[in-house]
Amino acid sequence: MADQLSEEQISEFKEAFSLFDKDGDGTITTKELGTVMRSLGQNPTEGELQDMINEVDADGNGTIDFPEFLTMMARKMRDTDSEEEIKEAFKVFDKDGNGYISAAELRHVMTNLGEKLTDTEVDEMIREADVDGDGQINYDEFVKMMLSK
């Protein structure tokens, strides 16, 4: 995971890490974690912080060493990327930019992708993703659909 980071990112994370490693022992406490991540432009919730700590704090001692920290930051960045990708994909479908994907827009994109769909198939796809029943897909519904694949 951390091997996907550039040298520049690693040295940036090392710098931030050492700012909060007050006693220089190579570990930071879980309480300091939120401050470190925010200094790097991330904005984790308390719940996310707790989950990340639980995932990487192998010995459960409540502190995180630098390799654990790198793994965690790489994960966080990967998740952010996929969010951006979903936003971009939504824009491709939402031709008129009104925040909704209509049946016509869905049919148009699917046809361009080489998928010849009947009206019934398009309506079925809309129905499956259309949580609020308004006959079109909004961004939240699109995200749910993409993440449930």
From Swiss-Prot:
The keyword Hydrolase does not apply. Ca(2+) 4 binds at D130, D132, D134, Q136, E141. Pfam families: EF-hand_7. InterPro entries: CALM/Myosin/TropC-like, EF-hand-dom_pair, EF_Hand_1_Ca_BS, EF_hand_dom. Ca(2+) 1 binds at D21, D23, D25, T27, E32. The modification N-acetylalanine is found at A2. Coiled coil: none annotated. Ca(2+) 3 binds at D94, D96, N98, Y100, E105. Keywords: Acetylation, Calcium, Metal-binding, Repeat. Residues 8-43, 44-79, 81-116, 117-149 form the EF-hand domain. GO terms for cellular component: myosin II complex. It comes from the Eukaryota. GO terms for molecular function: calcium ion binding. Ca(2+) 2 binds at D57, D59, N61, T63, E68. Gene3D superfamilies: EF-hand. This protein has four functional calcium-binding sites. Calmodulin mediates the control of a large number of enzymes, ion channels and other proteins by Ca(2+). Among the enzymes to be stimulated by the calmodulin-Ca(2+) complex are a number of protein kinases and phosphatases. Belongs to the calmodulin family. This is Calmodulin. It comes from Paxillus involutus (Naked brimcap).
